[in-house]
Amino acid sequence: CIILLLTIFEINADVKVTDCSKDEYSWCVEKCTKVRSKVRQCKVINDSVKCQCH
């Protein structure tokens, strides 16, 4: 179990998370609007945009 936690922690250390640019954010807005939601969070994780709608 401890080994597993360490592994997860190591992987997390390599993850690059940045805030979305305007373009990326509007892409999220588009995605969320399709499901009739608003953007809750927009992050770029290892160069791929992740959207959270609510």
From Swiss-Prot:
GO terms for cellular component: extracellular region. Expressed by the venom gland. One of its GO terms (molecular function) is ion channel regulator activity. It is found in: Secreted. Disulfide bonds join C20-C42, C28-C51, C32-C53. Its main location: secreted. Keywords: Disulfide bond, Ion channel impairing toxin, Neurotoxin, Secreted, Toxin. It comes from the Eukaryota. This is Putative neurotoxin-I. It comes from Lychas mucronatus.
